[in-house]
Structure formats: structure tokens, C-alpha cells
């Protein structure tokens, strides 16, 4: 485990400011090129949003690296972390893509299966699509997408398609993360922000009258996972889902370079990975502050907020994996 020099000014150290403020700071719009593919079940369309670099094809594959971002719950290519990473990737001259999970990115789900935090088969399917056109693939996952990517790296081992991975603000122990989200601010602020959109999607899907009644009564993510996520994805209960989908038990099996970045004050997380939980191929980067996918600093010289802490470390890690 290594500590870093991330040291925001005192007025930016609050974890909730770090978590909430980025949404309002990132103003840049990006002109993505969208392609639709079928999911791993061949049921629903999923959207891949690309930003392409100048490159040439050799034997049908682009030669510059592709950075793949797996988004968080209800995230998209327009999420603040996607846009800040995209800018850094463009500066490096690499390709960039956000493959959206089922029902995300404005593309409605067609089948009964949505997305969940442990669906590594879906990640493998997405990366397989991309590997057909790109020689070198680096992957980054944030929050829910970070847990899925970390689990993928351990579960697939040498068969993981990406060369290396960066995992940010990931709830690698889903049960304790669910408890953390039930704390006062989580229940009052974060839960409604995440829960309401996904319940609306579920209500628009193929559901029974009993499911409709239960979903309308859901008050927290645990309720939603028990009513919808677990049964839809073949789990007995939310606890069974959390146990099987959590990345933590798989971290010792990782054989490709993986960087896990976590803030100690992340309000979304419970149990986090320690050195004894991971393989020798995993680097743990832990900061005192940063909140959940925040890591905002401030430059007094330019009087501007700085959002590049995570993107710069991710790119440096990727380039070091070559």
C-alpha cells in the first residue's frame, strides 16, 4: 500500500463536498461517436461511445492503445469522471471508449436482465468486441464498474483481455457498502439520487404486479437489490448477490497489473482492500481525502479547480504497464 500527496485545501477536505461538487464543475461537452452492439445474452442493445485518436490499421487493428472506462451505477460517457478521463486520454494520443451497461447511456433494455456489480461475463464480452479492432487495451472502472473490473481481473486471470486495470472508489465488499449507504447522509442524499432513476427504469421493464408494488415501497439500495437485482440475475437474495458479486475475494487471484485507488473518507464504502487481501500484482493507492470519485484540488495560482488527480495517475499506470 502506498500513500499519496493528494492534499486538497482545508475547505475541500469534506468527503461530501468531494463527492458532490465534481458534477457541477465539469462543463466540457464531448462529441462521442456511438456504436450499438448486442449484450452478452444477445438480448439488449448496449451503447459504446468512442473518442478516436489519429491512428492507422495494421492487420485490421489500431496500433495506439485504447482506454476503456466502465462507469458507475447509472453513470454514462457524460459523467464527470468520464469527461475528465477522456480529456487526459486525448492528450496522451490514445483512443477512448465508454461501453455502457444494459439500460444506461439512454439505450433502453430489451430483455429482463439489467446490470449488476459482478457481471464479469458482460465485461469480457465488451472487451472481446473491442479486441477485434484494438491491439492494446487498458481498462479503468469506477464505483460499481470498478468492483466489476476488479472481480473480472481476478476471476479471469491470464484470460483477462485488457493488459492492466485501474479501479477507483470501488465497493469491493458490497454488503458493507450497502450498510454505509444507509447512514444518514447516504440515505437522505445519495440513495435518492441513485435509486429513483433505476427504479423508474425497472418499472418500465417487464415486471409483475407484485414487483411493481414492492419497488414503489423500496427505500434504499438494499431494498432494490432484494426485490429486483438479486432475483433478476439469478441470486437467492440481496445477501447472496453481495457475496457472489463482491470483488474482494478475487483480488488475490489477479495476475495482471492492477491499481486500486481508494479514499479513506469515501462515504459510499465499507470494508476496503488491505495488503493481505490482494496479489503481488495489485498496487493499493490510498488517500486520506477524496470522497467518492471526487479527488478535487484547487490551484490558487490559476484560481481554478483541478480534476486531473485520477486521470493522471491512471495514465501513468497504463504507460508503465507497456
Regions of interest found by a model, annotated:
Residues 80-98:
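Short amphipathic alpha-helix adjacent to the substrate-entry channel of hydrolases
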Residues 290-322:
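Catalytic active-site module of serine/aspartate enzymes centered on a nucleophile-bearing elbow/loop
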Residues 133, 138-233:
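Alpha/beta-hydrolase-fold enzymes
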Residues 86-88, 102-138, 304:
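Catalytic nucleophile-loop/oxyanion-hole region of alpha/beta-hydrolase
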Residues 11-60, 305:
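N-terminal cap/lid segment of alpha/beta-hydrolase-fold proteins
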Residues 227-250:
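Active-site nucleophile elbow and catalytic-triad environment of alpha/beta-hydrolase enzymes
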Residues 254, 260-262:
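Short beta-strand/loop motif that positions the catalytic acidic residue
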Residues 63-72:
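Short beta-strand element of the alpha/beta-hydrolase
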Amino acid at each position: 500500500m502506498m500513500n499519496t500527496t493528494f492534499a486538497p485545501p482545508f475547505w475541500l477536505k469534506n468527503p461530501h463536498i468531494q463527492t458532490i461538487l465534481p458534477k457541477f464543475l465539469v462543463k466540457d461537452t464531448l462529441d462521442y461517436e456511438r456504436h450499438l452492439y448486442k449484450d452478452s445474452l444477445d438480448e439488449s442493445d448496449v451503447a459504446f461511445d468512442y473518442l478516436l485518436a489519429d491512428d492507422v490499421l495494421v492487420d485490421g487493428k489500431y496500433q495506439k492503445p485504447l482506454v476503456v472506462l466502465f462507469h458507475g451505477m447509472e453513470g454514462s460517457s457524460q459523467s464527470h469522471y468520464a469527461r475528465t478521463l477522456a480529456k487526459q486520454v486525448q492528450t496522451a494520443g490514445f483512443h477512448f471508449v465508454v461501453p455502457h451497461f444494459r439500460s444506461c447511456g439512454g439505450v433502453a433494455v430489451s430483455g429482463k436482465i439489467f446490470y449488476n456489480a459482478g457481471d464479469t461475463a458482460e465485461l469480457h464480452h465488451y472487451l472481446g468486441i473491442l479486441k477485434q479492432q484494438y491491439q492494446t487495451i487498458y481498462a479503468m472502472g469506477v464505483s460499481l464498474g470498478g468492483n466489476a473490473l476488479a472481480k473480472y481481473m481476478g476471476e479471469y486471470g491470464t484470460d483477462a483481455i485488457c493488459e492492466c486495470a485501474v479501479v477507483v472508489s470501488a465497493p469491493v465488499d458490497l454488503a458493507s457498502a450497502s450498510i454505509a449507504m444507509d447512514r444518514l447522509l447516504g440515505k437522505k442524499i445519495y440513495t435518492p439520487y441513485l435509486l429513483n432513476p433505476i427504479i423508474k427504469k425497472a418499472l418500465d421493464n417487464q415486471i409483475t404486479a407484485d414487483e411493481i408494488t414492492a419497488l414503489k415501497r423500496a427505500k434504499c439500495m438494499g431494498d432494490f437489490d432484494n426485490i429486483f437485482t438479486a432475483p433478476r440475475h439469478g441470486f437467492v437474495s440481496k445477501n447472496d448477490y453481495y457475496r457472489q458479486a463482491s470483488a474482494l475475494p478475487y483480488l488475490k487471484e489477479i495476475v495482471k497489473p492492477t491499481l486500486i485507488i481508494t479514499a479513506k473518507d469515501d462515504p459510499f464504502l465499507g470494508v476496503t482492500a488491505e495488503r493481505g487481501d490482494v496479489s503481488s500484482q495489485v498496487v493499493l493507492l490510498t488517500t486520506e481525502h477524496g470522497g467518492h470519485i471526487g479527488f478535487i484540488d484547487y490551484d490558487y495560482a490559476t484560481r481554478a479547480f483541478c480534476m486531473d488527480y485520477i486521470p493522471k495517475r491512471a495514465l501513468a499506470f497504463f504507460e508503465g504497464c507497456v
